[in-house]
Amino acid sequence: MFQAFQQQRWRWLVFWAVIVAVAIAAPAVLPVFRLNLLGRFLSLAIVALGIDLIWGFTGLLSLGQGIFFALGGYGAAMYLQLNSSSGQPNGIPEFFSLYGVDRLPFFWEPFHNPLFTLIAIWLVPSLLAALLGNMVFRNRIKGVYFSILTQAALLVFFNFFNGQQKLINGTNGLKTDVTQLFGQMVGSPEMQRYFFWVTCVLVFLAWLFVRWVVKGRFGDVLIAIRDDEPRLRFTGFNPTLFKTIVFAIAGGLAGIGGALFTVQSGIVSPQYMAVPFSIEMVIWVAVGGRGTLVGAIFGAVVIMYAKSLVSEAWPQGWLFIQGGLFI
């Protein structure tokens, strides 16, 4: 048994050593455009880890992770917009003047603070996920009904954000590529390399965290919920609490992924809450392998890279491939 443990440990060490070597070599080998794409796809891998946690280990198929992904993106974009608005009239982002707004909305104010922004990026999605999850789980809603409710919530948030032109620029979204951070343009090659490194580190930390969650007693309870929730409830456990916690964790991971994706893509908009995108997130995990964690990471990166390459050669072709993958 000890020998098997040692072999598994060495396999993981070799695996991550190869990944680190690739991550180090990527900025020197890949053009800036391709490096930026890889950084975006790695940020999506963090979202995929959260989905694997709730679906692969707990049996909760959420079709609404785009809500939490977008919230993280909006948090990052709001800070960057404010950080670059010192020369604007009244010190507010330029888009407000298009709608006759001359005073910063109250909920924007805290995002002047970078520490608050970093906390809000994961805490706000986590709290919202906990609230929505608790309302659903305490009524013992599960299976396909849970999936339908998460998609319904996604549509509500999508339509709400689309209509808020005076608050968050509505369908146009918030741009980040022309904003500044640390005295440099966020969209510059230097900053994009920096974001790539940050994303690589956070993917690894997210994997470590989720692996720690599923390898302990907490993870055993999650698997028991997936396999036989009524029996677990009969033994005295409260599945509602565990499902709420794990759904909140997945929401927080989606928020972090959304923030990283936003600073590398240059914009956040309500389209992040579009139904097809949230369904696509599930495909990443399904292709990579439910309950594997590493498979979720590779699934997100490989599927999105394939989408990019196919779309460049045949713009409409990916829709057919995606449909086949979903089936």
Residue ranges and their predicted role:
Residues 1-327:
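Transmembrane alpha-helices and adjacent helix-loop boundaries
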